[in-house]
From Swiss-Prot:
Binding site residues for NAD(+): D47, A48, T49, Y50, D51, S96, L97, E130, R153, E190, K306, K330
Cellular component annotations (GO), alphabetically ordered: cytosol
Record-annotated active site: K132 (n6-amp-lysine intermediate)
Enzyme nomenclature, EC number: 6.5.1.2
Lineage: Bacteria, Pseudomonadati, Pseudomonadota, Alphaproteobacteria, Hyphomicrobiales
Named cofactor requirement(s): Mg(2+); Mn(2+)
Originating species: Nitrobacter winogradskyi (strain ATCC 25391 / DSM 10237 / CIP 104748 / NCIMB 11846 / Nb-255)
Chain sites annotated for binding Zn(2+): C435, C438, C453, C459
Catalytic activity: NAD(+) + (deoxyribonucleotide)n-3'-hydroxyl + 5'-phospho-(deoxyribonucleotide)m = (deoxyribonucleotide)n+m + AMP + beta-nicotinamide D-nucleotide
Identification of the protein by name: DNA ligase
Similarity annotation: Belongs to the NAD-dependent DNA ligase family. LigA subfamily.
Gene Ontology MF, one: metal ion binding
Any GO BP annotation: DNA replication
Amino acid sequence: MAAKSKTPPPVDSLTRSQARVEHKRLALEIETHNERYYQQDAPTVSDATYDALQRRLEAIEARFPDLVTASSPTQTVGAAPARGFAKVQHAVPMLSLGNAFSDAEVAEFVERIRRFLKLGADDMPAIVAEPKIDGLSLSLRYENGDLVRAATRGDGFTGEDVTANVRTIADVPHKLNGHNIPTACELRGEVYMLKEDFLALNKKQQEAGDTVFANPRNSAAGSLRQKDVSITASRPLKFFAYAWGEMTDRPAETQNDMLEWLRDVGFIVNPLIQLCHSVDEVLAFYRRIGEQRATLGYDIDGVVYKVDRLDWQERLGFVSRSPRWAIAHKFAAEQAMTILRGIDIQVGRTGAMTPVARLEPVTVGGVVVQNATLHNEDYIRGLGNDGQPIRDGIDLRIGDTVVVQRAGDVIPQVVSVIIEKRPANAKRYEFPDRCPICGSHAVREEGEAVRRCTGALICPAQAVERLKHFVSRLAFDIDGLGEKQIQEFYDDGLVMHPVDIFTLQERDARAENKLRDRDGYGDVSVRNLFAAIDARRRIELNRLIFALGIRHVGEGNAKLLARHYGSIESFRSAMTEAAAAQTEAGNDSEAYADLTNIGGIGDIVADAVVEFFAEPRNVKALNDLLEEIEVLPVAQARSDSAVAGKTVVFTGSLEKFTRDEAKASAERVGAKTSSSVSKKTDLVVAGPGAGSKLKDAEKFGVKVISEDEWLKLIEG
């Protein structure tokens, strides 16, 4: 570690805020040195330097005792860095909000509340209005005032445990201050990044040759989910608190007073929040925030309105996955004019060639936009997907003045051309008939708007994206082998095909330059990587089929194919037969007919699967892979179970299953699952926090059972 030229200020001169920031920095620095010393046997500082860091941390904690935590280096030694995220069930689901896009919809939201609560025509419920931060939702659990767990929102019911990472965020108190602290509580808010910090981070990433982030929200989310906690600590993350979940003793009776309480216990609450007493006040706040939007230091994508009285919130309850007592008033899509400087082609995992506009940089909604999607070649020509004219049939040309639109998280897009400003030298764009990456022919299938590269596995663009898909969560899901590592290994020629992942350890043993000698690696991380790869040498058939990256074959279709064929041998044999017959005699083979007769698999999916197996290089890649892995046959669903053939809906927070595991348990006993309750539903399995689906079950006369009853039913 390079010596710092500037002497830090004396501890006695630090303010509490300065001390808190330095305390976190010192704790992370010491933990990093502990890891290098205790885990890697590779210290990078002298004992004297390490002792000086430790003494300064102790001095800060002596002056500010409330900064001491159980995880402080003064209390423990050498905690290992996070290597993955455990699942966390939210005690109270983190639901989404309904949206309003007009003043009339906001007025109707207030009117619905008034009707539901049976208020008089002149009675206006007080409404708390607050900016809608464009970040990552986070739930913080405190017990006896101490932060014990932090979790991302996830699917609303199950999130990722990011406690170690969150402890590095200066805005998140490790201990709640003051009085009136509940025994247990879940406090919630948004992790975000300031615009100026985002730009500085991207500049640093670019200079280091690392991936840059698309926007502040993505950078905040990516920074929080780092497996190396020191990376999170190095990122300038912020946190606004604005809500809560489970709480043993609620300290206030209104939304506004709860926000004040959050401030009192140590959180930063957005200062722009306002209590409104009329629809006019609410809409005036919305317009004022909209006018300030570009000057704020952080991204917002609307305004959130919440009923102030908490007892009214409880009476109003929830509908579907959102509360009746709150709504998000989204900003209208924002537009700006700029110059179209060029058009590039991006090649995706399936070979889809997508045109991207390169624009003169322009600020749209407070965000600098330099690129925008152009969808496909018809869009450039002024035609929609139905072949009908769009933009009055005006094509896009290099040099045109165009209108760019950005709406929320949607990728910026070119929506119109200012034809009056078209220069005489504006250049027509000719869509390429060859892949710009590998030079293979690009073809456009009948009825499709997309042109695709036919290079398959020989196209570097597709190869990298296919490999990233291969290791994705629903496919092989190899811990420690994510998109960054795949790109790095591909660039260095270590992993060019799926099978290379499973021969990596063998080749590394023979290599002169070992993986452990690379930047960011070491003996421990390499051992863990190889162990994670070995753990995936046995995989379910549906995961393998999904991992192949066949067009139109997502998670659901992969399961349908796996259930039908049962084993990789049957699947491979049938598809090879269908592919051979397609070459010789069209699509009249018995194997093809069997494929199209699978419920849910139509001609489009069937053709895509057969086309995959008709490419010899794809078959070779699969055969090579099967030499290294074992594909588990599909367990046949029980036909003798009490729920065989029944339709089951799971709702609420499940304690013994994740949602995916619950669905799998139903499928194993021959049941079907659905996401909604209807007349066709046979059974609802309800956990804590179940909402409207229980009412629907009562409405349709559907039997409701608990999770424990479900377990007894399927195990019987």
